[in-house]
């Protein structure tokens, strides 16, 4: 946000909690809004009303949302408030692991999110393909930025010297995982795969 603040008037809207103090260190005006990760119709309606009220007051040119819940409420509120550019980045897709009535609800909410957005940015080509194949998003709105790695990697920042401390050689193949340690992120399958691979390939870490 520090980068964008050099060119735009940036407002960060998020619930208070973990990471809030770090958010306030950014060069942006921070406005707290209560938001629940879980499906909670009454609480979500209150949040939606707060966002609509905020967008009408601030009159932003662009609203950019992340995560399923923030995307649903943010894009719907921006559409109601007639914000001209409504951008949603798809960084989570719980629909793929949900079942029964929950899956139907999530399918509807995802479809509504993409319908309210003017631009949708899946974080990988695979994610884009899934969304389009399920028929819940308009392919004309979809764009995968930088093959899913829009920020890139600063190779000068990450040093290979750290691998020596944990005894990883140049010839070892190392896997990494970034995400919440949660079954919906596929952590169980990932650990099972690591165990299986290590039995056959000793140079995998």
Each model region followed by its residue ranges:
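Nucleotide-sugar donor-binding and catalytic loop/hinge architecture
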Residues: 157-174, 199-200
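Donor nucleotide-sugar binding/catalytic pocket of nucleotide-sugar-dependent glycosyltransferases
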Residues: 29-32, 111, 115-161
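A conserved mid-protein helix/loop that constitutes part of the nucleotide-sugar donor-binding site
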Residues: 173, 177-196
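Active-site proximal beta-strand in glycosyltransferases
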Residues: 62, 78-93, 110, 121
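Short His-centered aromatic/hydrophobic patch
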Residues: 65-71
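N-terminal strand-loop element at the rim of the active site
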Residues: 1-43, 130, 135, 141-142
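Nucleotide-sugar donor phosphate/pyrophosphate-binding loop at the beta->alpha transition
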Residues: 42-49, 84-85, 94-116
């Amino acid at each position: 946000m520090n980068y964008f603040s050099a060119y735009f008037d940036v407002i960060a809207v998020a619930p208070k909690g973990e990471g809030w103090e770090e958010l306030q260190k950014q060069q942006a005006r921070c406005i707290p809004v209560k938001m629940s990760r879980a499906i909670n119709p009454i609480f979500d309606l209150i949040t939606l009303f707060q966002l609509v009220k905020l967008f009408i007051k601030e009159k932003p040119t662009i609203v950019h949302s992340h995560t399923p819940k923030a995307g649903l409420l943010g894009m719907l509120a921006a559409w109601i408030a007639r914000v001209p550019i409504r951008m949603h980045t798809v960084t989570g897709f719980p629909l793929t692991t949900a079942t029964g009535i929950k899956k139907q609800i999530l399918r509807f909410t995802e479809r509504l999110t993409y319908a309210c957005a003017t631009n949708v940015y899946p974080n990988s080509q695979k994610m884009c393909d899934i969304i389009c194949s399920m028929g819940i998003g308009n392919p004309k709105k979809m764009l995968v930025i930088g093959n899913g790695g829009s920020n890139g990697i600063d190779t000068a920042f990450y040093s290979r010297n750290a691998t020596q401390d944990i005894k990883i050689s140049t010839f070892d193949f190392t896997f990494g995982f970034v995400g919440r340690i949660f079954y919906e992120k596929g952590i169980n399958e990932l650990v099972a795969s690591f165990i299986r691979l290590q039995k056959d390939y000793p140079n995998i870490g």
